[in-house]
Amino acid sequence: MRASQSPMLDPRARQLLRTLIARYIRDGEPVGSKTLAQHAGLDVSPATIRNILADLEDVGLLSSPHTSAGRVPTAHGYRVFVDSLVQMQPPGEEEVRRLRAELASGNGTQSLLGSASQMLSAMSHFVGVVSAPRREQFAFRHIDFVALDARRVLAILVFADNEVQNRVIEPRRAYEPAELERVANYLNAQFAGRALADIRACLLRELRMAKSEMEQLLAHSVDLASEALVPADAEDMVMAGQTRLMGVQDLSDLDRLRELFEAFASKREILQLLERTIQAPGVRIFIGEETGMVSLEDVSLVTAPYAANGQVLGVLGVIGPKRMAYDRLIPLVQTAADVLGAAMESPGTR
């Protein structure tokens, strides 16, 4: 979480703000001074509470709906709450067991990502989202080349996590089947278990240093690998539970909901937001306008990077209304990131 430009609040104001936001998140109704007098645990009169609430409204942490005598938090109020007032409720043992069971090591990467997004959605009751690792970060296990015609070659890549990608490439020249087999055998023997970027760089380096008898094979390998081992445009993000937001009271404006679902469909804006958080350790929270995207102004996004073997692979998180249970969802997202990262360290997935 990041620090915010928060006003200095005395202990009574902090306690009232904490109680008001917690009650509003729970009930979804504006909170008045009488309710706070009963539940804030302060020995002060309702009149004093009203004065403090007025001060909190003056500094932009609360607002007063026209139809109610109570108050509700603003986006700034939520920011102060998550940065300094929220009291975390980590997932229970049963929830952690569920996560570990669903994200069991040994499953393929795409299966793990799908399970992670579904579990986040089910446990948050909102939208679960997981950005996929770039294929360039994965080791490849095996490659085959099949000539399709005089100019096109099918490259079949099997990665260490058992995912298979088929890529049609157009090398600089036509290749005989025997040549393709020779190049595939060379790449498999020399580079199985290494990441794609490492292989391309190593091939170019070896070509510069090669002796004459190796130059032709290396040149052919560079020609084919320059296209076959470039990361393909794959599924960049997995989402689950989008329709859960259709029944959320705070997201009842149909025009804004339509904009939100268009962002879900295109994925581009959300993926860009996730990319902004990939190098930031721990949980990050974007509340409303903090996302920088009009389509996401009515929601909050709670994210955390997941990593395996010391390498950050992607980001996962929950998208929901600003009125969400931050105390529960912040530690849930961090736990899910830890469990997914541990599963990705398995030999069956990396």
Swiss-Prot record:
Database matches in InterPro entries: GAF-like_dom_sf, HrcA, HrcA_C, WH-like_DNA-bd_sf, WH_DNA-bd_sf, WHTH_HrcA_DNA-bd, WHTH_transcript_rep_HrcA_IDD
GO biological process: one example: negative regulation of DNA-templated transcription
UniProt keyword Repressor, yes or no: yes
Gene3D superfamilies in alphabetical order: 3.30.450.40, Heat-inducible transcription repressor hrca homolog, domain 3, Winged helix-like DNA-binding domain superfamily/Winged helix DNA-binding domain
Keywords: Repressor, Stress response, Transcription, Transcription regulation
Annotated GO MF terms: DNA binding
Domain of life: Bacteria
Pfam families: HrcA, HrcA_DNA-bdg
This protein's record includes keyword Lyase: no
HAMAP family to which the protein is assigned, alphabetical: HrcA
Function: Negative regulator of class I heat shock genes (grpE-dnaK-dnaJ and groELS operons). Prevents heat-shock induction of these operons.
Homology family: Belongs to the HrcA family.
Official protein name in the record: Heat-inducible transcription repressor HrcA
Organism this protein belongs to: Xanthomonas euvesicatoria pv. vesicatoria (strain 85-10)
Lineage: Bacteria, Pseudomonadati, Pseudomonadota, Gammaproteobacteria, Lysobacterales
This protein's encoding gene: hrcA
